[in-house]
Amino acid sequence: FSFFRNTWSKESTIITLHNLYLQTIGTLWKAQTECYRKLQDRPDRSNEAKMVKDAMPVVIIEGICRPHCSHAAANLEKMSRLAMYDLDHLNERTSAVKALFRALPYVAYTQTSISDRGLKVVVFLDARTPEEYPLAYAICQQTLERIAGHPCDEQCARITQPCSCVWDADAYYNPTPEPYPWREELDTDPSLTNLIKDKRNLPGSNGTPYATSNGSSSPFPPATEACGYIETFARNFTHYHPWQKGNRHESMLAMGRSARRKG
């Protein structure tokens, strides 16, 4: 799968899950991880904490992105058959839930989040196309949430959602995971397709598929060079400059200045 030096980069290399594990348990990202954890609870230094996190390398667990392109979903050109789940705010339950997931045959990897309060979990999902990925992801998510007794972050259901690298000496790696049996579960209970329909009907979601060049449909828009960059830019801008009622013009001017600095 793809490895980017930070969330803004359009230059990626290919890394294996085993290599990610070795770098995670080593000291490569230890200093940045400890720095973020010291800053995250200080309101006067929240911007510094955000900058430390944004500067961390990220991986796109779901596969390989096109060369010299962002990690936007439309730039995914080869599937890894893996999927990443994020359980935030586990807090004191983090270690216990990590132990639960280590016992599951389809879990390939776990790491503690950079916040030290949640988990990133990689599952051998065996989804072979972007079109079948959302349903496979949702079926497995339901199982993980039941086992953990805790919800997964819905934002990470988006294919190619970047996963921040981190230092975790207690990370877990399973070199021979079994595929999660989502196809068998779907055959047994066809109503599981409603998991996707329900998500598409949420406020702000768009359930309309996009046409592809071969006449089929896809849940992802056509590839553009800018889409991943723009999404990341907007998310980071609103973090540093929260929207305030009555300040529309000032916010637009600030966004324009920030965009010019980014080139």
Where do the model's predicted regions map?
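Catalytic "initiation/cleavage/transfer" segments centered on a nucleophilic residue
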Residues: 3, 127, 147-199
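DNA replication initiation on ssDNA origins
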Residues: 1-81, 197-201, 205-206, 225
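Positively charged, structured surface patches that bind polyanionic biopolymers
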Residues: 35-36, 41, 73, 92, ...
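Modules that initiate DNA replication and primer synthesis
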Residues: 44, 74, 78-102, 114-143, ...
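A common structural junction motif
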Residues: 105-107, 141-150
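Short beta-strand
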Residues: 109-115, 153-158
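Beta-sheet entry/capping signal
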Residues: 108-109, 118-120, 162
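Hydrophobic residues at beta-strand termini and immediately following loops
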Residues: 85, 110, 165
